[in-house]
Amino acid sequence: MRRWTREWTRAVACGLCAAVMVSTVACGQGAGQSGSGTDGAGNGGDGQTAADVESTGNENGQAGADGAQADAGTDNAAAVEGIVYQVNTDISGLDDSHRISDTLFGLFLEDINYAVDGGMYAEMVKNRSFEYGMEARDAQLHGWEVTSEAVEFSVKDGSADGTALNENNPQYAVVHNTGTSSATPHEGIRNGGFVEGMSIVQGASYDLSFYCKTDDGSVDAVTVSLCNEDGTVYAEQTIEGVTGEWQKFETTVTPDATEKRHVCLAVEIPAGTACFDMVSLMPQDTYKGLPVRKDFGEYLEALNPTFLRFPGGCVIEGRDEESIYSWKDSIGDGLAFEMNGEETVGDVAVRPQGKSIWQGSKAHPYYTTYGLGFYEYFEFCEALGCMPVPVLNAGMTCEIQSPFYQVYSITDEAFKQYVQDALDLVEFCKGDGSTRWGAVRIAMGHEAPFELKYIGIGNEQWQNEYHQHYRQFVKAFEEAASADPALYGDVELIVANGTASDSTEGWAYLAQNPDQITTLVDEHYYQTPEWFLANTDRYDSYNRDLQAKVFLGEYAAKANTLDAALAEAAYMTGLEKNGDVVEMACYAPLFSHEKLNQWVPDLIFYSNDSIFGSVNYYVQQMYGNNAGQYSLETTLTGAPEQTIYESAVDADGDVILKLVNVSQEEQNVHVMLTGREMTCFLPEADVTVLAGDDPKAANSFKDMAVTPQEGKLAVSENFEYKAPANSLTVIRLTALAD
């Protein structure tokens, strides 16, 4: 982030009025309670507790704190003209309605816009297992081409004669070099990666592997190289030892130059015939050793997410049975695989290729390699330090993209298998070595259990059939929890709520079935910026007496412009103020290739070698890095309607103020802090500002028009802040140690 120095971001501290008197409390009262995990009443020092004070509602639907203190603040605000932003920094009198979920801001990852295969997944070879079907251009050959006319290239299905590498990936390449090339004795096939060729870095190490055999004994060596179409070679190796049996060959290649586009991986043989499968090229420099592109992982880590919802989305629903995402397929159904004298379980080589509901391009067909499967997703959550929130199919296909969507009867064995898959996922994550799926996890290399608190059942379903299905999942989990409470007792199911901001089907179902073990209702909506600005108080009136809370599983303001991002920022002030009822919220979609976009808007854009965050990304980052445990009492007066939006939180004693100015004019805001003494904080606050002159400004590879800028601000009980036009400002007062 750049340090901000421009005149319009300058904020000065000043006394407002010598006659203003503010009520303060000792530092220990606020800091002592923060993040304590108690009932929210607070017991810092000798101050008041919630039991001492009558709770009253304010304009944000929150319970009131100390009435006398609030009255004093109101009088003080009345003495000041203009926009007044008043914050009570004392949390000792707050009740549970001010408690903010510790998983409020997170991520949702769906393989749309080529987000995973060809994107986040670090694999560089397209159609590495030769399993692309007839939907692809050139059928199974898609992604591959011969290096010269001297090569005959075909794909064989080895399932019939038992020649396949394994049962889950039956197809493999048969390459015959006729030996008629006058240019070189070695010819074969080459792969150009996903889009515009591969990107390589000089001196970087890349792990290259492939499976190979020769049925007629005519080939004993394979030459692999990184090259371009004009013949330039950046790295080359010859690997010997090919026999009549499948073997896995592994090596490392290091390019002698950097090329951002149009690099190919060539796999060549002398005159003769050889068979190939699972040809892979992956950079060694990945995110924390996982098969994740390093820049993708770092961009997500910078958001400081508390959870990750995966893998969809419509991906888990499918347009038909063939395109439904299967978590068991994503780990190769736990299949054991022996090669080169070693046995693996769930290896990528035994993961069947799946179709995607987002497959819609003949030029760039969309398949699911499952290279990033559930095992890797859970590991990725551990690396990010966030909670995994997997989503599973509910026994029916997508209601939106399937006019005649498929629904299994709850008596069908096929439906019962979907229920069993959900139970088995719990066993995979939490079971020990005595359980079937727990043993699979351990054999894959993860001895300790994975965290698992929530499972989403379905995505954007709302019909009666879905609720009938959901009821069967609930019944099965109740029975499982009764039989084995240690394994299943803590897992909670998430119920879908349709596709729009006015959808209420999930809530209506729970109202009719209050005994259901549901704690989260999954709301999804994509709206205009104007809608978000007009509905910042959406959750003020939600019923606090219900067990179920809100999971805002997908939302966005339909554009990647500054004004849309600020509308989301304004809306997020309402999420913070209602953090007692909104348990989790995540923007969607997460990633998009710059040239393969299937949905607008998106949070992060990428190419083969670069990545950038949209303006919306930086809004999420500023909130994710400035979340709190308590929503503080605030009042805002004197602001023109739908101009200034605000929230304030306590984060382990730090006080964090957020101001969103959606007008195209600078706004002078008088900030008044009551409650804790200012000696509780450092004299200067950290300030982060996201702003721009043009509300339609958007970021791109060529122009990062809007990014956060950081600075310092001297603060006092009363100070003035000039909120720039079109801006989000975060002011963080750092608490001193007691």
Stretch-by-stretch model annotation:
Residues 10-28:
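Sec-dependent N-terminal signal peptides of Gram-positive bacterial secreted proteins and lipoproteins
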Residues 22-47:
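Sec-dependent signal peptide cleavage junction
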Residues 73-369, 387, 402-416, 467, ...:
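Extracellular and organelle-lumenal recognition/adhesion modules and their flexible linkers in secreted
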Residues 107, 210, 304, 381, ...:
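Conserved, mostly hydrophobic/aromatic
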Residues 231, 236-239, 248-250, 276, ...:
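Active-site cleft segment of glycoside hydrolase catalytic domains centered on the general acid/base Glu
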Residues 238, 642-678, 687, 729-732:
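Carbohydrate-binding surface patches
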Residues 253-257, 261-264, 284-305, 362, ...:
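An active-site-proximal structural segment forming one wall of the substrate-binding cleft
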Residues 475-480, 501, 509-626, 662-664, ...:
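Catalytic-core region of carbohydrate-active enzymes that cleave or remodel glycosidic bonds
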